[in-house]
């Protein structure tokens, strides 16, 4: 399991599911936001296998 830290840059929907673009390092990845209660732009999140698992307050190193 690889956990990465990112910042939500865009929120949308795809096929009835909540998705978003998350800035991870220098890359932008499209991920599922379905597990987050109320995602907003700029939220810091932990991502695993294309799914945002939780919001975080500080980067996890």
Say what each PLM segment does.
Residues 1-61:
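Exposed beta-strand/loop interface patches that mediate assembly or binding
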């Amino acid at each position: 399991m690889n956990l990465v830290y990112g910042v939500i840059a865009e929120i949308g929907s795809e096929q009835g599911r909540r998705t978003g673009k998350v800035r991870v390092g220098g890359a932008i990845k499209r991920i599922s936001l379905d597990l987050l209660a109320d995602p907003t732009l700029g939220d810091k999140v932990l991502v695993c296998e294309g799914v945002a698992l939780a919001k975080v307050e500080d980067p996890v190193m």
